[in-house]
Structures are given as C-alpha cells and as structure tokens.
Amino acid sequence: PWEDNFNEILHNLDEIIKSGKIREVGISNEGAWGTMRYLNEAKNNSLPKIITIQNAYSLLCRPFEGDLAEIAHRENIGLLAYSPMALGVLSGKYIKGTAADNARLKLFPRFARYSSEQSTEATKRYLKIAEENGMTLAQMSLAFVNERPFLTSNIIGATNLEQLEENIE
C-alpha cells in the first residue's frame, strides 16, 4: 500500500515551531487530498495546523476555486497566491509584443499553458475589459485576485520599479 509522510513532516515542523524558528505552518503546490491529509494528521495527533497554502492563482489559472477554495474557507486557511500575473502574461506585454528578450515565457517555454490559443484569447478579452474600465490589465488582474474571499495575500514579482509601482497602485 501507499505510505505517505504527512505525520512525519508535521512532527518535524512541530519541533521547529517549539525551537522558535517558525511560528506557523503552510504548504505549497498542494491539492485538496494532500491538504486534507495535513489537516487530519494535525487534528488527530495534536500537531500544528496549516494556516496557509501557496498555490498559483490568477485570471488564467483558477484550479484553486474548486475543492481547495471550499477547504480553505471551512478550515480557515489563507491562500498566498503566487503568479497572480500568470508569469507576466497578464501585463499584456506578450500580446502587445513588448516582452523583453529575458521575459520568463521566452526563457522558459515549458510554461506554455499561458501562451496557448485559449490563454491568448482570454488575455485579449481581459485587456479590452480593463481598458474599457480605465485600468491596465495588470491592475485589473491583481484586483481580481485581491478580491477573492479566500486570499490572504498575493505574491507579486516585478522586474523594475515601474512594474512594482503599477502592481501596488
């Protein structure tokens, strides 16, 4: 049978908490099954409960909205959304042709999910909606993520000061 190590991981994290090196426990890139395993192990063995989950979340990447959103709501677990700009796609730079040579999707083509025909079409439609409402695509994309009730914080990445200013505006 399949054996997992959720209990062992939580025991080790409990020791790190007790040593004062960390205060709380979170997970990353986990699905609904794994999240529930962590929660059950914590509850059944008086171990630390996870309080955050760090997963990708954006207008173009929304699997969290399924079972994980319900788990997060019911168990009071906050989402730390990474890649809320879908690796820069939701800045509009790829469809506008202004992406630098060192842009992520040019350097890492394996992230093709954001440059598929469907993603490109969705990005064009989102850009139109943003412009019709007096926002940049980046501002609208971050506003969408920030308005989710299960969000604790988003994790933005900016290559320059101009991008950072637009992201926090």
PLM features: residue spans?
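Beta/alpha (TIM)-barrel catalytic core signal, keyed to glycine-rich beta->alpha loops juxtaposed to Asp/Glu
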Residues: 2-169
